């Protein structure tokens, strides 16, 4: 009995939250007498503990979801659930949270966040953001780095399975580019696009995106 209590005491916050989800809301089956909408609402409420209400995260650990592309959100939630997205933060925070999400619940969660108003970045004029804008709009031809806007859109709004980057936390974007470059987050296209970026160039383009 003492060992069980000790295990509960040593659960990390993400693991504890994951247990709450697994027990309470994320099976994707509506409670008796309830509805699928109720299940989605309950799950979104749990999501808000990290991503904040309406997906307007204030912590760079957790991405802003408000206004994100629905198709992208669906793909990522399915990847978390199926453990095919395996970067360290995905494993720590999202594998447990998404473990029992059904496809209909995932669709409802994605639709909810996609319908929210995106967080606007804070425009900052600096040499760093100017350099980042150039990478975003023109790429780095000498290093075979394409313009980010060619896929993500002129305003970094994304399209379908291609994510919105505008107004996202700089630290989060930096972490993702580093994960793509190292293949900790598997994506062949993004690996090719990011593997030759220097830390300074990553800092520049992510600083610019955070201002949009």
Task: Locate the predicted segments by residue.
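Sequence context surrounding c-type heme c attachment/ligation sites in exported
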Residues: 24, 37-48, 66-67, 75, ...
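Bacterial N-terminal signal peptides
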Residues: 14-24
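Electrostatic cytochrome c docking/interface patches
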Residues: 26-44, 56-61, 114-141
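The canonical Cys-X-X-Cys-His
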Residues: 47-54, 109, 145-155, 205
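Bacterial N-terminal signal peptides that target proteins for export
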Residues: 2-15
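Axial heme c-ligation environment in periplasmic c-type cytochrome domains
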Residues: 58-64, 80-117, 122, 159-164, ...
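The feature marks the first
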Residues: 33-83
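Predominantly soluble domains enriched in secretory-pathway, periplasmic, or organellar proteins
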Residues: 27-31, 36, 74, 115, ...
């Amino acid at each position: 009995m003492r060992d069980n209590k000790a295990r509960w005491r040593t659960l990390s916050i993400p693991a504890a939250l994951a247990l709450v989800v697994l027990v309470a809301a994320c099976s994707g089956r509506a409670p008796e007498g309830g509805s699928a909408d109720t299940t989605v609402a309950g799950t979104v409420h749990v999501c808000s503990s990290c991503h904040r209400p309406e997906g307007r995260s204030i912590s760079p650990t957790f991405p802003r979801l408000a206004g994100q592309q629905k198709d992208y959100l669906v793909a990522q939630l399915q990847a978390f659930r199926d453990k095919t997205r395996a970067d360290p933060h995905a494993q720590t925070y999202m594998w447990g949270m998404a473990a029992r999400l059904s496809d209909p619940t995932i669709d409802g969660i994605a639709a909810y966040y996609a319908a929210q108003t995106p967080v606007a970045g804070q425009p900052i004029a600096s040499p760093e953001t100017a350099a980042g804008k150039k990478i975003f709009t023109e790429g780095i031809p000498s290093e075979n780095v394409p313009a980010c806007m060619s896929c993500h859109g002129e305003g970094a709004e994304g399209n379908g399975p291609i994510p919105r980057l505008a107004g996202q936390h700089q630290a989060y974007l930096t972490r993702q580019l580093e994960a793509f470059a190292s293949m900790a987050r598997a994506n062949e296209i993004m690996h090719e696009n990011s593997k030759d970026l220097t830390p300074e160039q990553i800092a520049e383009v992510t600083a610019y995106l955070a201002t949009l």
